[in-house]
Amino acid sequence: MNKVFKIGLIGCGHIAETYFRAEKYFNNIKIIKCADINEKASKRCALNYGIKSTTVNEILKDKQIEIILNLTIPKAHYQISKKALINGKHVYSEKPLAINLNDGKKLLKISKKKKLYLGNAPDTFLGGGIQKSKELVEKNIIGNVKLGNAVFAFPGIQSYHPNPEPWFTKKEGGPVIDMGPYYITALVNLLGPAKKVTGTIIQGQKYRTIGIGPKKGKKFKVECPTTYLSTITFKNNSVIRLTLSFDVIAHQRNHIELYGEKGSMIVPDPNMFGGSVLTCNKLGDNWKEFKTTKMPLGRINIRTQSSRANETPTNANYRGVGLSEMAYSIENKRKHLCSGEISLHVLDIITSIMKAASSGKIQYINTLCVKPKKFSKLDIKKLLK
């Protein structure tokens, strides 16, 4: 029987709903208190989920809380996580780890000094889709991966989010900070650490119009680049072309394609947990499908659309498994999978892409991480209710 960790939630925005739902799937996490700088949001969250609303300072000082779940906006991630660590709490944060590399390094240093766990989303790479892809890559089904493409492109969230402005601000906005962590974390999981990046930016519309909610019809200024084109070279010499854009109305590209010496692979959406993996090993052959619907974290559990959790119908969403796996790792004194080291390396790649794009110069990645081990079925079953 796993220990149930008492969790304090800071940041009661839309994504919080997903972590409360995670309690239905995983047996070792329980959110008992919540806090937000917006007291109304905190009280509403507490009422909805039958927990206690409190202040940020009170939740950080609460001795019964063992893990702080940091769901604040990106620019607040560093300060909240730092305060939590200083107060002796383990931390699991939404992505990114911080909005600049130095702050990320500081968090990792504090966590190591105080012997605390620092975890970070995304945890989607633990799902059936990416784990099956990892299994096939490591079984050498397509041979050594030489190159590939990764694409996230859509017109932006302003049409369906009532408060889209933070996604377009100067320091924390743009597609690299928002969606980059999903794609880059998946690629690091499949190919290992990166060594250098290049980048180019495209500036889309100067103003966007909010399409829903009380501010519907209001225009706001775009302060950041809205398309990044990057090339990531990994330490194993694989080269991946990455496109991240808020300027594309529609496209028919696959999320990730890997091209090896013996074949090609289509990797499912790294922003979700399920999806089929496809491989082809001979020109003109049909693609072979590897379904993940019978895998523990690939089973379909979503039937309705929910932009709040980036969900699509007939898909799998088990967000929160990274938090659960970290809690299990704390109890069993082992290394967790959504680790601070991996998150810092991903942050290094993200900030380096932005620097490369603005400067026109190659940026070298200075952080290191170990490619995550496979998330075994046995370990998954230990966490599931």
Residue ranges of each PLM-predicted region?
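N-terminal Rossmann-like dinucleotide-binding module
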Residues: 1-49
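Conserved SAM-binding strand-loop segment of SAM-dependent methyltransferases
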Residues: 50-58
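Beta-strand-loop-alpha-helix segment that lines the small-molecule cofactor/substrate pocket
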Residues: 66-67, 73-74, 78-125, 140
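Hydrophobic residues in well-ordered beta-strands that form the structural core
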Residues: 93, 118-120, 149, 242, ...
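C-terminal capping/lid region of NAD(P)-dependent oxidoreductase domains
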Residues: 116, 143-147, 166, 355-385
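Predominantly a Rossmann-like dinucleotide-binding segment in NAD(P)-dependent oxidoreductases
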Residues: 124-221, 360
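C-terminal glycine/acidic-rich active-site capping loop/insertion
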Residues: 206, 210-223, 229, 234, ...
